[in-house]
Amino acid sequence: MQIKLANPRGFCAGVDRAIEIVNRALDVFGPPIYVRHEVVHNRFVVDSLRERGAVFVEELHEVPDDVIVIFSAHGVSRAVQQEAERRGLRIFDATCPLVTKVHMEVLRYAKRGQECVLIGHAGHPEVEGTMGRYDTSFGGQIYLVEDEADVENLEVNGPERLAFVTQTTLSMDDTSRVIDALRAKFPQIDGPRKDDICYATQNRQDAVRGLASESDLVLVVGSPNSSNSNRLRELAERTGTPAYLIDTAEQIRPEWLTDVSAIGITAGASAPEVLVQAVIERLQSLGAEAPDELAGQAENITFSMPQELRERVIASE
């Protein structure tokens, strides 16, 4: 049984940055460090940081006064940021810079008097943060749609002054169809020069298509609450290749491997490589050969830490 590894896979620059911010804050200031929401959607990562002294909370009212709080990579609403400022909390913002870019687009549309449509999944923290970045004091509204049916039912106040943005971790194919539906219904709709789906999401989706075409089974390493990991599993399945989303190697069921001669492995943008290697070891214990890494898009993007934290790290070294 062959093992084929997607390339690229696993951590993206935004996830790397967010995890580094928490780790460096723990190094410099010591525990506890409070983190609003899971810093990234991966159980292994969150548990590892919790063991170091990170305390994960869902809302700021769970945070005592005079502590350090880190905002997760998914971003937060203006209301959350303003509450933190009102309380005088010391904040390090681990919001992915590509999510921040969408926040700025939303605010710019609001200030122009344009209403905004956000394409995204209801309840996802990135969506909640982005919705909360639209400033309704300028007279407009922001609307959420997930699919073409939502677009068909969408009614807006100002169709001639309308724009759209997207969640960064969506399926490119699904999003393209929703954008087409928006443009068909609202021909004057404005949008970003380039869609908001991030480079890492695009690269991993391109890679899993190629991987699935060469595999009898695809395993996606990632947590169930990871949006981009779920999209990878869905994309593999759409090619006709069975696919499973697994958090750990222990979740692999031997019966999945019946009559499988080539198994593909990829990982969501929040899944560490150590989990991929554990999956490889588990498969090899079940008779698989050494893995073959497929060619793919090289990634060399990095994002820097917040300046204050960066300076404190340098001073402590």
Curated annotation (Swiss-Prot):
Residues that hold dimethylallyl diphosphate according to the record: H41, H74, H124, S226, S227, N228, S270
Cofactor(s) the protein requires to work: [4Fe-4S] cluster
Superkingdom, taxonomy of origin: Bacteria
Database matches in Gene3D superfamilies: 3.40.50.11270, 4-hydroxy-3-methylbut-2-enyl diphosphate reductase, catalytic domain
Keyword Oxidoreductase assigned: yes
Family from the record: Belongs to the IspH family.
This protein's name: 4-hydroxy-3-methylbut-2-enyl diphosphate reductase
Lineage: Bacteria, Pseudomonadati, Pseudomonadota, Gammaproteobacteria, Oceanospirillales
